[in-house]
Swiss-Prot record:
It comes from Hydrogenobaculum sp. (strain Y04AAS1). One of its GO terms (cellular component) is ribonucleoprotein complex. One of its GO terms (biological process) is translation. The keyword Ribosomal protein applies. HAMAP family: Ribosomal_bL28. This is Large ribosomal subunit protein bL28. It comes from the Bacteria. Belongs to the bacterial ribosomal protein bL28 family. GO terms for molecular function: structural constituent of ribosome.
Length: 63
């Protein structure tokens, strides 16, 4: 599965619990977006970044 380029966040597995306490497997997926970023050496690269890292300004988008 895909992971965030910055924080390496990826899908995790858990259970969904119904009102009658039945448990079903499910997947919690991060909100990954494909963005073109500027690398430290000045080049650009298209990577998958989670929205939490985008909002925090941990990457510089290439325009």
């Amino acid at each position: 599965m895909a992971a965030c380029f910055v924080c390496n966040k990826k899908a995790v597995y858990g259970k969904s619990v119904t009102f009658s306490a039945e448990r079903n497997s499910r997947v919690f997926k991060p909100n990954l977006q494909s963005v073109k970023i500027r690398m430290p050496d000045g080049s650009t690269k298209r990577v998958m970044v989670c929205t939490k890292c985008l909002k925090a300004g941990k990457v510089v988008k290439a325009v």
